[in-house]
Amino acid sequence: MNPRAKGYRNEMKAQKILEAAGYLVIKKVHTKYSPGDFFEIYDLIAHNENGWRCVQVKTNRRETPELREKIEMFPVSPGTTREVWVFYDRVSEPVIHVI
C-alpha cells in the first residue's frame, strides 16, 4: 500500500468525521512546491461556534517527539484545541490525543 495514499485517505476520513460533527474544515492542498501542512504542523483546521480544532492526522503511530514539541510550542487562542488523530489499520475510529 502506498503510504502517501493511505495518509491522504485518513485525512479525508478525519475531515468527514469533523464535518459530520458540524465543523467547517479547512485542508491545505499538498503541492510539490509548498509544505503540505498548516504551519508545517497541522493537516486540518476545523471551526464551529464552540471554537477551533487544529488536527494532525497520523497513521499507525503517534507523533514524533520533535513534532510533539512543535505542537506544544505553537501558540493558540483560548477555545482552541491541538489534537493528534491516529488511525490504526483495521480500526474504524481514530484514537484522538488532545495536547
What spans do the regions from the language model cover?
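Catalytic phosphate/metal-binding cores of nucleic-acid and nucleotide-processing enzymes, i.e., regions
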Residues: 1-99
